[in-house]
């Protein structure tokens, strides 16, 4: 894959909503011999704007090392639809299983303002990359 970002971290801001993501490889839950690579990612969503906003839906685009794409859409995150007042933040951790040692994720959260305005808060691309024994990340 030529379009992998170099870091397992991403940051994006949209209309005062900052989304920061960091991914980690979970070797104890993975089984490379079975093409099973497990990753966790932690997302921090911060309202740096002047108006409250509520996260209503998520849209993830997950691309594995072979270029196969999986889209995930649904209400909220980890069973919640957090409403963030100015200065507030929300953090959660979730996971992803790939059949390749590398991949990427990106997407958006649909946010609603109190006045009914809707916008998509961008989740910038970040890398999912298994680590070899030396701790170096695998890259194609």
Positions of predicted regions on the chain:
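Asparagine-centered strand-capping/turn motif at beta-strand->loop junctions
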Residues: 45-49
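Short, conserved beta-strand element in jelly-roll/cupin
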Residues: 40-44
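Membrane engagement elements in two modes
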Residues: 1-38, 50-56, 63-140
